[in-house]
């Protein structure tokens, strides 16, 4: 199921102040509205290296419609389409598209499921996922308005995001 937190390369770049920055990893949390729901909300966090910020976090709403996942970014109105995807309990792959142009393949691995207390390696014993529940808060209360830095957010617009060319 899509439910849970996934980590990997989504081939995202951002432009800020005329400079292009590559996202090193994206962490996406999908929270369905109910059991077996095809809609929900969540968070999308893009991590950067070599920038004046470490990450940018966004609230998302998503829906599975006609064999694709439509992801809407609340703060900036951005929309992504995920198609031809395969999901199992530990792996999520497919193609990401923004403007109905060229799609790029992505691969993500599941790092957390907030509604379960066992891992995804079929060993069957419990664990505490300190990364997902500690370093990155599930409610993102420390992120505020989903910007990477209050100083940067107050002085400049957010980065413009797109799928790599």
Description of each model-found segment:
Residues 1-9:
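N-terminal helix-cap/turn-to-beta initiation motif at the start of protein domains
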Residues 6, 22-26, 135:
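Extracellular/luminal Pro/Thr/Ser-rich low-complexity repeat and linker "mucin-like" segments
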Residues 7, 31, 109:
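Residue-level detector of conserved, well-ordered beta-strand and adjacent loop positions
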Residues 8, 40-42, 94:
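Small side chains
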Residues 12, 65-165:
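Beta-sheet ligand-binding and adhesion/scaffold domains
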Residues 14-16:
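Structural motif
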Residues 18-68, 158:
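N-terminal glycine/threonine-rich, aromatic-flanked beta-hairpin/loop signature
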């Amino acid at each position: 199921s899509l439910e849970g937190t996934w980590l990997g390369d989504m081939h995202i770049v951002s432009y800020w102040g005329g400079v292009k920055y590559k996202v090193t990893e994206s962490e996406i949390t999908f929270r369905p509205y109910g059991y077996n729901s095809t809609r929900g909300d969540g968070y999308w966090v893009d991590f950067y290296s070599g920038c004046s910020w470490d990450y940018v976090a966004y609230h998302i709403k998503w829906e599975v419609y006609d064999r694709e996942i439509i992801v809407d970014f609340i703060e900036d109105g951005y929309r992504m389409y995920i198609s031809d995807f395969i999901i199992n309990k530990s792996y999520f792959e497919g193609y990401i598209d923004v403007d109905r142009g060229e799609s790029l393949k992505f691969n993500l691995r599941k790092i957390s499921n907030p509604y379960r207390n066992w891992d995804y390696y079929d060993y069957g014993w419990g664990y505490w996922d300190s990364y997902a529940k500690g370093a990155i808060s599930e409610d993102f209360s420390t992120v505020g308005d989903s910007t990477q830095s209050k100083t940067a957010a107050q002085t400049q617009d957010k980065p413009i995001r797109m799928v790599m060319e």
